[in-house]
Amino acid sequence: MGFGDFDEICKKAALPLCSLVGPSSAISGSTGIIPNCYARNIELANTIIFEGAASFLHIIALGMTVIMILHIRSKFTAVGRKEIITFFYIYMALTVCSLVIDAGVVPPRSGPFPWFVAVQNGLTSALCTSLLVNGFVGFQLYEDGTALSVWLLRLTSTVMFAVSFLISILTFKSWGGLSPTNTLAMFIVLYIINAICIAVYLVMQLLLVLNTLEDRWPLGHIAFGLLVFIAGQVIMYAFGDVICDNVQHYLDGLFFATFCNLLAVMMVYKFWDYITKEDLEFSVGIKPNNWEIKELLPDEDRRTTVYQDTNSEYAGSMYHHRASTYNGHGY
């Protein structure tokens, strides 16, 4: 195996791009590297679903992402709110694309399949780039939530999406000097650059916690997220085929990688949620009536007014004791 080749990778892991790279078959004439083992298909309502377990996890990941986005949106004044929510929007788009590919909605060997896989690769690079830029937000090098901060994140993520997408589709289609057997550029973009982005993010968050925070609990979120992410990659690329054989093709490495990636993304959310504070005066909670009066004040403690004169013709008016319920406060 040479540097940049996908031969050994695709034999261990049933990645979608594996059917688009490698030498042409002498029999069929089509490209593709067949993995040693891959999860069996399932039939549901006369429909064949590929990678059933991984596809089910993608659906769970979508639900969890929606919940995390709603919680982020509720923290109205938290630092880096707009930036981190962009990261989760990209993750949601990547999950939808992965679900479409893994479940076989766009089957391999079909015309649109290379384009969908190229989009998946592009979203992967955009996600890692978004994570990298989010790593600098906490240092307040520039004001978070401003047009500069938000568009810096969006533009860098878009650029990396375009680079990864173009290199992938050029490789799959044998355009521009690239080919399914010349995968070095795609390997560098998908593995080397993305790994650098993740590593820089981790270093920046360690510096942020150690230099600016007294609480060390956020380090636990970072450590756990890193461990599960590494575990998922090791299982998929080193032991995926072994696990697949031992469970009779019900699961493969892609299932465990998807699960571990979800946990790692959840730890990114937990870390951000833990280190961010917000001004309670302007916060918007998910639950209504964040402020409420538990009991009424005694009569002697109530605010007196000029209308307390019992001789007044308005003393018995129903408007005398009216209380406003605006924002849960009594007036």
Swiss-Prot record:
Keyword Amino-acid biosynthesis attributed: no
GO terms for biological process, alphabetical: cell wall organization; chitin biosynthetic process; protein folding; protein transport
Localisation: Endoplasmic reticulum membrane
Membrane topology recorded in Swiss-Prot or TrEMBL: Multi-pass membrane protein
Cross-referenced Pfam families: Chs7
Magnesium as UniProt keyword: no
Segments crossing the lipid bilayer: 52-72, 84-104, 113-133, 150-170, 184-204, 219-239, 249-269
Major location category of this protein: endoplasmic reticulum
GO MF: unfolded protein binding
Record GO cellular component, one term: endoplasmic reticulum membrane
Keywords assigned: Cell wall biogenesis/degradation, Endoplasmic reticulum, Membrane, Protein transport, Transmembrane, Transmembrane helix, Transport
Oligomer and partners: Interacts with chs3.
Entry function: Chaperone required for the export of the chitin synthase chs3 from the endoplasmic reticulum.
Family per record: Belongs to the CHS7 family.
Protein's UniProt name: Chitin synthase export chaperone
Organism: Emericella nidulans (strain FGSC A4 / ATCC 38163 / CBS 112.46 / NRRL 194 / M139) (Aspergillus nidulans)
Name of the coding gene: chs7
